[in-house]
Amino acid sequence: RPEETPLHPGDNRVGAWHIRLSDTPAPDALAVRPGAWSVRPWRREDGLTLPGSRGRRSLKRLLAERGVPPEQRDAVPVFCLAGQAAAVPGVGVDASAVPEQPGNTIYIQLF
């Protein structure tokens, strides 16, 4: 079971992932609220409550709906806020991690 790796402002290299945390908007970046962010591979028990959805859905199902085949899911980073899955590139940001106030936003970019 891979561990979470804490992320710091600026550029982060975690395995094959190159991740940037910044307060500057960027194309394809995930807009999230500030906090203790970390990254890890997806886990079977992960789920997200996407804004406007009718409740929590499994990440497995969300990835499948977006056409990510099972053999590629381990390559998808899961960004965690305070240890909980909160944002996934190509899927979205959990309602709990959406920025509460304009200007108080962190942008997570994957290269």
Predicted regions located by residue number:
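AMP-forming adenylation/ATP pyrophosphatase catalytic core
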Residues: 1-111
